[in-house]
């Protein structure tokens, strides 16, 4: 006679809560930390109440971002009480402890082993003979259909307004074969859009001397942005390049966009156009050459969307400098623009520059640049009315509507496409949409199947 099956009661694992702040690069770090903790046997909690420990992954790029991080730490302590701090503000442990003495541990940016060790110390996982049998599987904090793909860490540039190199160090590139393996797994799991990120995507592979690495299925790939983009484009997902520095070799990825191999989208933070301001920022200052290159890119790939960010009110920026920037934007006709008012950041060389711009002048210039770029955007989007565009669906509602993005729009930072008569669509679907209307930032349309 067979014995009845034995009931095995596994111990309940501790649960981890995560607050991830800042840029997509921080989000990828959070995913990596949680992936490791889950493979170690930890559970995840979507709220403070259910968490045994809360991780706060901080951002320290601007003083306003630091204040947001400190507020998040305070909220986590008030709501839960057991908090571990990691990320860019980890270098300011003394200041954090002075304000929040109850913090359990503080680790720095990309100190993955240290933060995982701190979690183990704070909330040990009960012994289980089954945990080691579970393979480590990637955990995502984004919707299933798009994923951020970090290809390197750190930066070799020393822009005067930036402290990222002091936090994250010089450029360290991942092996291209490892990046491609990760991308293949993401696509196999349902990712339809890969957003390539780093501190400086165009410098990828410089520290590896752009050498070639063997691929699992045969052949090889160089550690170089163009070669990596070409291989990623073969996976069948949209491939979107972010944080690109305007090196000459960026020209070589434009034909890949024209061929349809990667998404015709380029995120290049130009930061300014006035040569004196760019010089003070320690950025490239050949703005006329940049305009020539933009024209060349559009000649090769007419549908390319160019996104950029700019800083207004930088120390020493005169009204003449700012007007130069506005005139440059009129010529450049960029598709998507974000702007920031200059903020001093502790440790940044720009803090010591003369010619501080009054706050009221910063606000006035910020309003002017946003009005300028909104008008440019409105005209460019109006020209798309009547066209049919591929749109990736991000969300659907109960009334037959949906929201998605064209190839010209990255998630969260760019515009959206609002659809009517979109019943039956699901997030992640890529559909042809007839554009019916536009405003300053968004498009409005109907799926071609519904329009016919």
Curated annotation (Swiss-Prot):
GO terms for biological process: tRNA modification. Binds 2 [4Fe-4S] clusters. One cluster is coordinated with 3 cysteines and an exchangeable S-adenosyl-L-methionine. PROSITE patterns: MTTASE_N, MTTASE_RADICAL, RADICAL_SAM, TRAM. Its main location: cytoplasm. [4Fe-4S] cluster 1 binds at residues 23, 59, 88. Its cofactor is [4Fe-4S] cluster. It catalyses: L-aspartate(89)-[ribosomal protein uS12]-hydrogen + (sulfur carrier)-SH + AH2 + 2 S-adenosyl-L-methionine = 3-methylsulfanyl-L-aspartate(89)-[ribosomal protein uS12]-hydrogen + (sulfur carrier)-H + 5'-deoxyadenosine + L-methionine + A + S-adenosyl-L-homocysteine + 2 H(+). One of its GO terms (molecular function) is protein methylthiotransferase activity. It comes from the Bacteria. It is found in: Cytoplasm. SUPFAM superfamilies: Radical SAM enzymes. Keywords: 4Fe-4S, Cytoplasm, Iron, Iron-sulfur, Metal-binding, S-adenosyl-L-methionine, Transferase. [4Fe-4S] cluster 2 binds at residues 155, 159, 162. Residues 382-449 form the TRAM domain. GO terms for cellular component: cytosol. Residues 14-124 form the MTTase N-terminal domain. Residues 141-379 form the Radical SAM core domain. Its EC number is 2.8.4.4. CDD domains: Radical_SAM. PANTHER family: RIBOSOMAL PROTEIN S12 METHYLTHIOTRANSFERASE RIMO, RIBOSOMAL PROTEIN US12 METHYLTHIOTRANSFERASE RIMO. Catalyzes the methylthiolation of an aspartic acid residue of ribosomal protein uS12. Belongs to the methylthiotransferase family. RimO subfamily. HAMAP family: MTTase_RimO. This is Ribosomal protein uS12 methylthiotransferase RimO.
């Amino acid at each position: 006679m067979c014995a009845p099956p034995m009931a095995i009661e596994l111990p309940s694992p501790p649960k981890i809560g995560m607050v991830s702040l800042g840029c997509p690069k921080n989000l990828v770090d959070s995913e990596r930390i949680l992936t490791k903790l889950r493979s170690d046997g930890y559970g995840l909690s979507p709220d403070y109440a259910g968490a045994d420990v809360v991780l706060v992954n901080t951002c320290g790029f601007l003083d306003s971002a630091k204040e947001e991080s400190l507020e998040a730490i305070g909220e986590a302590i008030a709501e839960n009480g057991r908090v571990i701090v990691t990320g860019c503000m980890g270098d300011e442990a003394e200041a954090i402890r002075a304000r929040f003495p109850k913090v359990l541990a503080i680790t720095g940016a990309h100190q993955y082993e240290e933060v995982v060790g701190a979690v183990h110390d704070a909330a040990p996982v009960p012994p289980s003979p089954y945990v080691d049998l579970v393979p480590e599987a990637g955990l995502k904090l984004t919707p299933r259909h798009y994923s951020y793909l970090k290809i390197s860490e750190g930066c070799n540039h020393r822009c005067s307004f930036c402290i990222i190199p002091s936090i994250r160090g010089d450029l360290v590139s991942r092996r291209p074969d490892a990046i491609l393996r990760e991308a293949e797994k993401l696509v196999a799991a349902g990712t339809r859009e890969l957003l390539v990120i780093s501190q400086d995507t165009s410098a990828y592979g410089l520290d590896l001397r752009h050498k070639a690495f063997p691929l699992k299925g045969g052949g090889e790939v160089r550690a170089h942005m163009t070669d990596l983009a070409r291989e990623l484009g073969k996976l069948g997902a949209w491939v979107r390049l972010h944080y690109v520095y305007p090196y000459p070799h960026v020209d070589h990825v434009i034909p890949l966009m024209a061929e349809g191999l990667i998404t015709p989208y380029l995120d290049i933070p130009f930061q300014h156009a006035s040569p004196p301001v760019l010089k003070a920022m320690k950025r490239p200052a050949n703005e006329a050459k940049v305009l020539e290159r933009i024209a060349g890119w559009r000649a090769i790939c007419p549908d390319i969307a160019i996104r950029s960010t700019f800083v207004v009110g930088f120390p020493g920026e005169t009204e003449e400098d700012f007007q130069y920037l506005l005139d440059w934007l009129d010529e450049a006709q960029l598709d998507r623009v974000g702007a920031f008012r200059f903020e001093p950041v502790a440790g940044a060389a720009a803090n010591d520059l003369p010619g501080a711009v009054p706050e009221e002048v910063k606000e006035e210039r910020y309003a002017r640049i946003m009005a300028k770029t909104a008008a440019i955007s409105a005209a460019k989007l109006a020209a798309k009315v009547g066209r049919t565009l591929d749109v990736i669906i991000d969300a659907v509602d109960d009334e037959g509507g949906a929201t998605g993005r064209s190839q010209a729009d990255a998630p969260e930072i760019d515009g959206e496409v609002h659809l009517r008569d979109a019943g039956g669509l699901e997030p992640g679907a890529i559909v042809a949409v007839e554009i019916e209307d536009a405003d300053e930032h968004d498009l409005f349309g109907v799926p071609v199947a519904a329009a016919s």
